[in-house]
């Protein structure tokens, strides 16, 4: 019998608290403090519930440790904090490696899985070594300890022992279903176009109409209506770095001069036979607001404008009104962006410090989860896609999540790197409908490679979107994209990767009836491109 599984439903062997006033050496044995906080670990419905009680000393993190024998483990694969940034990779047992939310451990025969259920109140990260498993639960508010007034469940721990007869990818998918009891899934397939990666914000009502006509030509054989998604570039305030500093926030009740009315644009899209979609950034504005509504920290990548504090009830009301207004314009899909960055920055791990949100009784994850639920409630029956959002919080709230990094209409290497997010395909239709981002069709990128990317999305049943310069496709390319969109409109072919284990970019896929696909992501540069920039 392989030594590669520890039952996390057993009571942890140890707990350790990091308080707001803990010393830097709080993990050193000679710095251990007598526990002054209460925590419970109870097993209900095959999950270990971690309940944290109010503490006189605000708590920042809780460390739980299960000791056991994992000496036969060969490889581990963790998830990403929010969207993947080429960081979802198989590796050998690496004890200091942080694995957000959950991880898989392969022992050469079976895949064992360890994690927490979606919707956790704390930011959860695992570490694994041959002698045990460590779980860190980050319950900070901003960079400070949480000041919770009542006991609350900070995470629900789950695990799954694999079987040697299972395909590892299937084991991972089953575990994702175990982590998310009530996924929200789209009623119809999400496919069509998003105009970001060919227009990069240079759009108008007229360009959207031209694009919609081209979309309907590409989707001539589709069995459902496609989406025409209007991305960044419609709002009244938008500046590029070459002008007044980069800004792409609100207010959202006004358009720029290139659009007369976003409701009229949505209606015109519908009249052409497509569904309408639109993008917005809910937590950034140029509006003057009272100081308590401002976020405690400014996003360094957006030096202009104001970031809003989503823990404040007035901010939630503003976001709700904006979302409901956009839905009232007739948009069938709403994509909201940047909420994780506008609240916590690019990484949750390096944000310690004396800063906090307006409501100090909530953790960072509770604040964001409440924001996502507010947006979904206001969107009504519209499909919502989260971008730059926390995937483990979006699950069970939104129908889709942008799971990977940006693709590109400027060079394919960025798109190839974004293929790493397909390592998250076990989450597809278990958490939500995975959105790998857009294939791009411009004069600067290879159409064949992007058709492969789009087909990969379609055959697996993932969100299938492209950014297509109107009129750019050759006849052969048009014929192929029609076939791809037809497959996407039917919900895909049920294709699964056959090279998920041990890789970080998958190439080989097979359908249940034995049809095989092999995508060569490296032929564009005869390998990989090493020297490039996002803008070239």
Label each PLM-derived region with a short phrase.
Residues 25-29, 203-207, 342, 470-482:
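Surface-exposed flexible segments
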Residues 2-227, 333:
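Carbohydrate-recognition beta-sandwich/jelly-roll modules
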Residues 54-56, 68, 120, 139-141, ...:
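Short, flexible loop/turn elements at secondary-structure junctions
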Residues 102, 224-443, 449, 477:
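Aromatic- and carboxylate-enriched substrate-binding clefts and catalytic-loop regions
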Residues 201-202, 238, 467-469:
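Short helix/loop capping segments that flank catalytic or ligand/cofactor-binding pockets
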Residues 190-192, 350, 457:
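Surface-exposed beta-strand-to-loop junctions
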Residues 138-140, 147-156, 194, 361-536:
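Active-site-proximal substrate-binding groove within the catalytic cores of carbohydrate-active enzymes
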Residues 77-80, 222-232, 492-503, 536:
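A generic structural motif
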């Amino acid at each position: 019998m392989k030594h590669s599984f520890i039952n996390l439903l057993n009571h942890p062997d140890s707990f350790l608290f990091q308080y707001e006033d803990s010393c830097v050496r709080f993990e050193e044995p000679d710095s251990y403090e007598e526990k002054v906080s209460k925590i419970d670990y109870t097993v209900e419905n095959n999950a270990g519930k971690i309940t944290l009680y109010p503490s006189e000393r605000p708590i920042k993190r809780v460390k739980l440790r299960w000791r056991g024998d994992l000496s036969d483990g060969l490889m581990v694969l963790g998830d990403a904090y929010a969207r993947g940034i080429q960081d979802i990779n198989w590796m050998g047992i690496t004890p200091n490696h942080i694995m957000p939310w959950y991880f898989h451990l392969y022992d050469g025969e079976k895949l064992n899985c360890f994690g927490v259920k979606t919707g956790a109140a704390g930011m959860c990260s695992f570490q694994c070594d041959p002698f045990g498993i460590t779980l860190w639960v980050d319950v900070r508010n901003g960079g400070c300890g949480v000041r919770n007034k009542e006991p609350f469940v900070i995470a629900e721990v789950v695990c799954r022992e694999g079987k040697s007869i299972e395909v590892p990818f299937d084991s991972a998918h089953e575990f994702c279903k175990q982590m998310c009891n009530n996924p929200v899934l789209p009623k119809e397939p999400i496919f069509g176009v998003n105009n970001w990666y060919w227009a990069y914000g240079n759009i108008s009502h007229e360009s959207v109409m031209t694009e919609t006509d081209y979309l309907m030509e590409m989707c001539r054989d589709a069995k459902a209506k496609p989406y025409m998604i209007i991305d960044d570039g419609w709002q009244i305030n938008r500046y590029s770095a070459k002008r007044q500093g980069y800004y792409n926030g609100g207010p959202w009740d006004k358009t720029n001069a290139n659009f007369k009315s976003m409701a009229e644009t949505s209606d015109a899209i519908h009249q052409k036979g497509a569904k309408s979609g639109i993008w917005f950034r809910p937590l950034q504005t140029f509006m003057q607001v009272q100081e308590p509504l401002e976020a405690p920290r400014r996003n360094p990548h957006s030096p202009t404008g104001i970031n809003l504090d989503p823990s404040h009830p007035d901010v939630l009301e503003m976001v709700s009104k904006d979302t409901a207004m956009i839905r009232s314009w007739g948009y069938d899909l709403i994509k909201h962006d940047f909420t994780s960055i506008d609240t916590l920055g690019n990484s949750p791990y390096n944000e310690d410090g004396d800063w906090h949100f307006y409501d100090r009784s909530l953790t960072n994850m509770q604040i964001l989860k409440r924001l996502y639920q507010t947006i979904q409630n206001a969107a009504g029956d519209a499909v919502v896609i989260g971008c730059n959002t926390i995937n483990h919080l979006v699950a069970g709230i939104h129908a889709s999540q942008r799971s990977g990094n940006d693709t590109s209409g400027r060079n394919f290497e960025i798109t190839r790197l974004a293929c790493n997010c397909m390592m998250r395909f076990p989450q597809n239709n278990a958490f939500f409908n995975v959105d790998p981002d857009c294939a791009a069709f411009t004069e600067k990128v290879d159409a064949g490679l992007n058709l492969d990317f789009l087909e990969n999305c379609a055959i697996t049943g993932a969100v299938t979107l492209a950014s297509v310069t109107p009129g750019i496709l050759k006849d052969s390319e048009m014929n192929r994209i029609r076939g791809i969109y037809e497959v996407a409109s039917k919900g895909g072919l049920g294709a699964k990767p056959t090279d998920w284990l041990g890789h970080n970019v998958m190439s080989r896929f097979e359908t249940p009836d034995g049809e095989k696909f092999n995508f060569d992501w490296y032929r564009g540069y005869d390998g990989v491109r090493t020297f490039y920039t996002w803008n070239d």
